Amino acid sequence: MASSNSSGTETLATGFSLTGITDPGELRDTAQALDEAGVGFVSLSGHILSAAAGRYPDRPTPTYASTYRDPFVVFSFLAAHTKRLRFRTAILILPLYPAALVARQTADLAVVSGGRLELGVGISWQQAEYAALGQETRGRGVRMEEQIGVLREFWGGSLISLRGRFHEVDGLGIGEQPPPIPVLIGCGQADPLLERVARIADGWLPLGGISEAGPIERLRKLTADAGRDPGAMRVGSRLAVAPEDPDAWLAGARAQHHIGVTDLTLQPPPGTSRDDALSAVLAAHAAITASPAISPDTEA
């Protein structure tokens, strides 16, 4: 059983981002090593298209010049090669997709993975990607909110009929009720954004991670105000795990756990070799596991 931190939340679940790894064999081998070590989850970006490096000089983070593997395809592949590892989109740009298609894809992935899917969603600022896919950027936040409701209706397994601002469904369904699919929203810390998370999401993925307790405390209060259990709200963040600085791993993990973080993505510095990055992640996970106050819930 997982213990609780000072905020009443579950102990840390550790994870690793696979974004940037494109070779199928390397994806498989990395996922298997993480799975065997008891790491809780892996994540992949949900962007569809790449841009030229340096296209957005006013944006210090990310350039969108990477090759993006489709997370539903990759996770289906990895599900066949792992046993416990959970799969998280971080983040799927939900307004780029038809909600009915995502309902189908996520339900199938939840089934074939044995209930190991977590759907992290967000809206992005990359207007060119929206335009290329025939979608509007205006109103994408409220559209995403409606999409989440539509997804949950489809996941109920029955034929549904609904008419919303952006969606109309007349007596259609996906034909089954998949295992539960947690929905986490990636966004900033403004109160309207946290209020949306509190009302409709199962977790929050703060953009760029988080280092202070204040926003998490606000989120938990908003969650309680919405009539939901604040202790069940998951909160993600990131922890730098430089191979040459293992002493900082536990201190950083303890600090994140203390402010209420529940899900910690272990992140080697840019430029670290693949082998060194994996070794650092596995070593950091082992160190966190060995610390009783912050040991991960490996059953998650």
Question: Language-model features: where?
Answer:
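Active-site-adjacent structural elements that line small-molecule/cofactor binding pockets in enzymes
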Residues: M1-A300
